[in-house]
């Protein structure tokens, strides 16, 4: 079920990607509100997909390539939604929506149903360390995109 939700999120994120492409080509915002609604719905599907994957494999799903790309894509979506709700900078979406789509697409391409976790990643420390790294990368990218706008 989590794979279906990830594919649904990818489809919804593609609306955001289309918004970004059309905005760059036409040099004016093109259907931002539907794209924002699609990204919100995509994030909900994406987060549910990550939770369901974690429930199935019985560990925090960030250790495999598929899981890491998926988690990072979801965090970037969450980071954008938080930044947008606070600052209302819609032009940030031109940079963020393509990254969300690409990360989710790469996660979909590298999907591996094997729940086997490498031995080196069985430490409890990894469950604190890796999410903090991804939060840092997300904050760095959002700040980079915002700085690039100004």
Regions inferred by a protein language model and the residue ranges of each:
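Polytopic transmembrane helical bundles with strong interfacial aromatic enrichment
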Residues: 1-150
């Amino acid at each position: 079920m989590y794979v279906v939700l990830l594919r649904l999120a990818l489809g919804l994120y593609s609306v955001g990607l289309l918004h970004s492409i059309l905005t760059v080509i036409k040099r004016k915002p093109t259907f931002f509100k539907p794209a924002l609604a699609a990204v919100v719905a995509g994030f909900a599907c994406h987060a549910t997909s990550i939770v369901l994957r974690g429930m199935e494999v019985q560990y925090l799903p960030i250790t495999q390539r598929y899981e890491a790309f998926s988690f990072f894509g979801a965090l970037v979506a969450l980071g954008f939604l938080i930044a947008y709700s606070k600052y209302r900078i819609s032009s940030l979406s031109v940079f963020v929506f393509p990254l969300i789509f690409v990360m989710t697409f790469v996660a979909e391409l590298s999907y591996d149903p094997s729940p086997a976790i490498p031995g080196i990643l069985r430490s409890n420390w990894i469950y604190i360390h890796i999410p903090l790294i991804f939060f840092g990368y997300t904050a760095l990218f959002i700040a980079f995109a915002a700085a690039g706008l100004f």
